[in-house]
């Protein structure tokens, strides 16, 4: 199962913060102070004129932001500088922004699946093609990245000099080698380049010998992917669009992804955590003696199990605080290895030794391991208006209590959650005499969220009745609106019993 965007942002943000020098911190603070300055080149949009603005421009970048967001404030001056520079481009490249925290603009945030701030999206062809912006966040980098994005998706390589200028030995570069720039193979290659241009750089050529390590006798057509890790070059002759996308995806991630302070590794980390495949993660201290012996064994294990549906990561504890928080790990368990499978079940081996890694992985593949669950301790005292639930008691509390439960999944750092907290307290106090109703909350950063709940952002609220009916709460955020919703939708004990009795009985099953 892929990790939510909000958590991926936290995982990588912590690594970036840890790697940034003090001077960067001072610059960021200065930027935050000036972040509210009026922008001139950035186009300000709202729900009323958004569609019209998108329809006017064949290419436009839109930042969805919140005024209280620190990262948005840091981006603001860089985004404005980039907008000023890009306004001189021929044709001009338009940068815009939308306050997604404004009530009137929230439908836009929902429509475009905005789950964190700031989120930047590229609108192409009057909004017919929408892609995530995956480039730098400083002015010079934004300008360079967007100039590439408005050009052709794939650039023709006509000479060795072109190849030298385009193919960076520190980045992934994908080249289509053809006998002629036409036909199904070429068309499919350009289609994939257009679709994936936000993620990769593409080129095409009629002359394989122009390329690094080129071979004039190469059998064409061919796709050659250059990368700064593992085997450095990998080829494919399958030009089916889906097959080509899978080839690029599989080939563009290291056999073992490294989670450290090096920002060059962050694109691979992003792909790793976004993948729906099972993930094996070894965390240890990179600066201690045993690191090399662990690394050798772990890379060997990744090679041994390369045909399994699993990806591998090795992480330095100094850069992995976000991962430890997400998975519920502790530094006193290091060295440790943890697996998250495609269904989000986790399996943990703390204090692992190098010679235990392969055998433990085999036990996982053989289905012999018991899952690990992240949970805070069950509260000994739980007498506040809003009750605290944790992973170890959420099923009993929410699904087996015989009550109507409004449960909030929150993050301690979430601004919206902080605003909602006193409102939920007020609603719970109003309803305290109703023995059929409970309002509860779970820290979703410190507990595994049950699979029954789809939590993609914070706060997320669900209303669960005694009969098991479960609906997302998407009504108003005032205490009166919450109370009104609960009163209209709650079940009495008698109603719940009637629904349970009228439900069709499940057929008996032979467990053998």
Curated annotation (Swiss-Prot):
The EC number(s) this enzyme carries: 5.3.4.1
Location of this chain's protein in the cell: Endoplasmic reticulum lumen
Residue(s) at site: Lowers pKa of C-terminal Cys of second active site: 477
Protein known as: Protein disulfide isomerase-like 1-1
Position of sequence motif Prevents secretion from ER: 509-512
Pfam families recorded: Thioredoxin (PF00085), Thioredoxin_6 (PF13848)
Keyword Disulfide bond: yes
Role summary: Probable protein disulfide isomerase that plays an essential role in the segregation of proglutelin and prolamin polypeptides within the ER lumen of endosperm. Required to retain proglutelin in the cisternal ER lumen until ER export and, thereby, indirectly prevents heterotypic interactions with prolamin polypeptides.
Site positions for Contributes to redox potential value: 70-71, 415-416
Keyword tags: Disulfide bond, Endoplasmic reticulum, Glycoprotein, Isomerase, Redox-active center, Repeat, Signal
Domain Thioredoxin span(s) in chain numbering: 32-151, 372-491
Gene Ontology molecular-function annotations: protein disulfide isomerase activity
Site features described as Lowers pKa of C-terminal Cys of first active site, chain residue numbers: 137
Known glycosylation sites: 285
Active site per UniProt: 69, 72, 414, 417
Disruption-associated phenotype: Accumulation of large quantities of glutelin precursor (proglutelin) in the endosperm.
């Amino acid at each position: 199962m892929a990790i939510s965007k909000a958590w991926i942002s936290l995982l990588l943000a912590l690594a970036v913060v840890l790697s940034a020098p003090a001077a960067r911190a001072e610059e960021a603070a200065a930027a935050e102070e000036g972040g509210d300055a009026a922008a001139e080149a950035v186009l300000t949009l709202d729900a009323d004129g958004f569609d019209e603005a998108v329809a006017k421009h064949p290419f436009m970048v839109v930042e969805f932001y919140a005024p209280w967001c620190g990262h948005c404030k840091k981006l603001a001056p860089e985004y404005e500088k980039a907008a000023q520079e890009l306004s001189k481009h021929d044709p001009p490249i338009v940068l815009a922004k939308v306050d997604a925290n404004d009530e009137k603009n929230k439908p836009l945030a929902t429509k475009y699946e905005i789950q964190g701030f700031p989120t930047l999206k590229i609108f192409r062809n009057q909004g017919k093609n929408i892609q995530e912006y995956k480039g730098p966040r400083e002015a010079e980098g934004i300008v360079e990245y967007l100039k590439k994005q408005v050009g052709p998706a794939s650039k023709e390589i006509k000479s060795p000099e072109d190849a030298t200028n385009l193919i960076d030995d520190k980045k992934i570069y994908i080249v289509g080698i053809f006998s002629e720039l036409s036909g199904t193979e070429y068309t499919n290659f350009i289609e994939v380049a257009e679709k994936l241009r936000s993620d990769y750089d593409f080129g095409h050529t009629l002359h394989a010998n122009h390329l690094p390590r080129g071979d004039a006798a190469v059998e064409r057509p061919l796709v050659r992917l250059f990368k700064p890790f593992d085997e450095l070059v990998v080829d494919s002759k399958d030009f089916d669009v889906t097959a080509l996308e899978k080839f690029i995806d599989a080939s563009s991630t290291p056999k073992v992804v490294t989670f450290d302070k090096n920002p060059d590794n962050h694109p691979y980390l992003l792909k790793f955590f976004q993948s729906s495949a099972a993930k094996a993660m070894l965390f240890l201290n990179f600066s201690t003696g045993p690191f090399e012996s662990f690394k050798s064994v772990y890379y060997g294990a990744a090679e041994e199990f390369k045909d399994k549906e699993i990806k591998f990561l090795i992480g330095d504890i100094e850069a992995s605080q976000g991962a430890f928080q997400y998975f519920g790990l502790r530094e006193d368990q290091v060295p440790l290895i943890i697996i998250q499978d495609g269904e989000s079940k986790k399996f943990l081996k703390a204090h692992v030794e190098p010679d235990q890694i392969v055998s433990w992985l085999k036990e996982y593949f053989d289905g012999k391991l018991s899952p690990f669950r992240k949970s805070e301790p069950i509260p000994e005292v739980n007498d506040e208006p809003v009750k605290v639930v944790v992973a170890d008691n959420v099923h009993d509390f929410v699904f087996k209590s015989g009550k109507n439960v409004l449960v909030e999944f929150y993050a301690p750092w979430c601004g919206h959650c902080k605003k909602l907290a006193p409102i939920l307290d007020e609603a719970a106090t109003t309803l305290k005499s109703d023995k059929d109703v409970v309002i509860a909350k779970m820290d979703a950063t410190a507990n595994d969220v049950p699979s029954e709940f789809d939590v993609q952002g914070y706060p997320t609220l669900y209303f669960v009745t005694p009969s098991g009916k479960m609906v997302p709460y998407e009504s108003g955020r005032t205490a009166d609106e919450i109370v009104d919703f609960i009163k209209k939708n709650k079940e009495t004990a008698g109603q719940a019993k009637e629904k349970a009795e009228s439900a069709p009985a499940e057929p008996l099953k032979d467990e053998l």
